[in-house]
Amino acid sequence: MKGFAPRTGLCILSPVLKDTMQIEGGGYWPLLTLRGACATAAAEIRLKASGMNPDTLRVNKTMFFYKAIEAVSDEDTLATDAMARIAGGIGCFGELYASVGIHGFKLASARNTPLNQAMPLDMASLLGRLMRYKDHLFREHPDIYETQDYLEQSLENKGWPTTDYTLACAEVGGRRVLNVIASVGGHLLVVFMEGTDVSEETLMKKAGELIQVAKDNLP
């Protein structure tokens, strides 16, 4: 879809991974949410591993280096306390993969709800299928929904409890970034999207479509 950055995509994470994977999207993970915690892009959480470039989002058995999290403003408690909350989430989830390369965003909106712990999942073949479906969706459904609640409505209409996902949207200089983490059938899905001169509603609509595709194709 016109305006979307190439790094828009979807990733499925599991606490048990046998193989190193290249996540489609390059070196950006603008927002990160986990188990109700939400950090804005002011938080830089870099993946550190021997012989690995953290900006490529390559996934492996790693340790994590937490760089200082800067608050977007004095009132932005989501940013100031995110490090401890995310670290606590890692203790429950087992492994987390993230690299952040964008600064200066302000938090536009955030909805936080509990997430279930993810279960093991064979990601490689499923991720490839989802990326192909994503390309089709972006070509065939370019329309913009007028409500910010599209994602919630879509999931509720499909019988998916909205308590199983969390999302946040940030914006700067005409660019918007949306990150959604959702628990589907015991799996953890991460949708990360960036658009230039596109609305928050558009990002949410595309995220909802992408999540539904994932839900329909999970084993």
State the predicted function of each range.
Residues 58-75, 145-160:
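Short, mixed-charge aromatic SLiMs
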Residues 41-53, 85, 125-132, 212, ...:
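Short glycine/serine- and small hydrophobic-enriched flexible loop segments
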Residues 7, 68, 74, 78-135:
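Mid-domain, small-residue-enriched loop/turn segments at the edges of structured enzyme/sensor domains
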Residues 9-11, 28-56:
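Active-site SXXK
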Residues 10-18:
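Short hydrophobic alpha-helical segments used for membrane anchoring or interfacial signaling
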Residues 28-33, 37, 58, 62, ...:
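Soluble non-cytosolic domains of exported or imported proteins
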Residues 1-4, 20-21, 27, 131-219:
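Structured C-terminal helix/loop/strand segments within mature extracytoplasmic catalytic/sensor domains
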Residues 45-66, 90, 137-141:
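Short, well-structured active-site flanking segments
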